[in-house]
Structures are given as structure tokens and as C-alpha cells.
Design a protein with these regions (language model features):
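Charge-biased low-complexity segments
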Residues: 1-113
Length: 113
């Protein structure tokens, strides 16, 4: 990714077409479940919950700048950041028919069975 910045690098909050995980929401949920490493410390303390992570989905679909907006536990937060950082490229958001950078929130649900 280049260091050049111009007006086209603006990060949008609201766009005509939101970014999306390849193959949709169910595929995203399945991917998260398959790739999640539930922290042992959280298992031992029976900690569950939903971590809300905000990311930027770049024009090329890459996920950058993950930030926890709603925390459950430091170890779960760390795993949520690891998960979203390792996701495959998304379908980028669009505004006026062009790919744009978009802030997007992802909920990671940690549930013990």
C-alpha cells in the first residue's frame, strides 16, 4: 500500500453499497467459527460475549486498522483483533459506482458450548 494520500483516500461512514464478506454473512460466521482460537484464560473463567470491532475496508477489500469498540475481556478482544486482521479480502464498499474506503463494524461472538 502506497504512502500517497489524496481526496480519494477518504474513509466513508455511509456508502451506497456496504463492504461485504465474500459469499455473504453466513460464510463470514462460518469463517469466524472455523478460525477462532478461544483463549484458554477466558475458557477457564467461563467468559463469553460479543466483541465489536471497527475496521477500515480498503478499496482492494483488505481489512486494516482494527479497533475494539465494545470490549468483553482483554484476551477475547485480542483474539477478535487477530481474527478480523486475518480475514480474507472483502468485497469493497462503493460510492457513486467506485470502490471506496469504508469504516465497518464486525461483531465477534464468543460462546462456550
Amino acid at each position: 500500500m502506497g504512502e500517497e494520500e489524496n481526496e480519494n483516500d477518504e474513509v466513508f461512514e455511509i456508502v451506497e453499497k456496504n463492504p461485504s464478506f465474500p459469499e455473504g454473512d453466513k460464510a463470514q460466521t462460518d469463517w469466524i467459527q472455523q478460525n477462532m482460537r478461544y483463549p484458554q484464560s477466558a475458557k477457564e473463567k467461563n467468559i463469553q460475549g460479543r466483541v465489536l470491532v471497527q475496521v477500515i475496508v480498503n478499496k482492494d477489500g483488505s481489512i486494516v486498522e482494527p479497533k475494539v469498540l465494545r470490549s468483553v475481556d482483554p484476551d477475547l478482544d485480542k483474539e477478535a483483533i487477530r481474527l478480523v486482521s486475518s480475514m480474507p479480502k472483502w468485497i469493497p464498499g462503493k460510492n457513486n459506482g467506485k470502490e471506496v474506503r469504508v469504516h465497518h463494524s464486525i461483531v465477534i461472538t464468543f460462546r462456550l458450548n
